[in-house]
Amino acid sequence: RIMCQTVYYFFAMSRIDSSGKECMFTVPTGNFGDILAGYIAKQMGLNIRTLNIATNENDILTRTLNSSVHELSEVSMTSSPSIDIQISSNFERLIYDNCKDSSYIRSIMSDLNNEGKYTLKKEILDKIKQTFCSYSIHTDEVESIIKKYMQKFDIILDPHTAVAIGAAERNSSKYDVSITLSTAHPAKFKDTVSSIINNNEFVPEHIINMMKKDDNLVILDNNIDIIKNYLKENIL
């Protein structure tokens, strides 16, 4: 999945003239997968100056970059649920790439499991911050961003994209080019978005029709051969 997501960054940069320019990508993220793909693209030579980590109230990544302490807290339920997590399973991959020390990774992961936190070494954090920054955008600001972009640009954002837009606006003035990765069609979060803009006409008709269909639930035994046979007979 991360390999596929790396293509997003090359595709976006192919659409602009970025030569000699300072470029920033802002990505809404909880599990650190999509933005890790951006880091890989940068390591491959793509002209990315900064990767901006956009978080919501569940701001463990923002707090880590600001303080070096990666500490778990209670998960807050927000309008951007894909960011509502505390353990970013891909973040340790970034740490490893900036220290190349598997024993250190095992040590901090043990601290996280046993104590609920770890502290990054200064030299590792400093190296990470050469590429990454991070901003936390809360739910009330998400709502105002969705309203603003609807009124000003006639663009309907889903809540995750609004988180990213908010984070980008905090930092974009420093760069020649600012690109924000969008997450999903707003119809995926119809109830949240429609309550903010007082309109639900943005939901495509084919999705409306799909949601009217009956659910089809099949319970299978926990057996790989049974699952394979079901897929062959009913789907493939």
Q: Which residue stretches match the model-derived regions?
A:
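PLP-dependent amino-acid enzyme catalytic core
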Residues: R1-L236
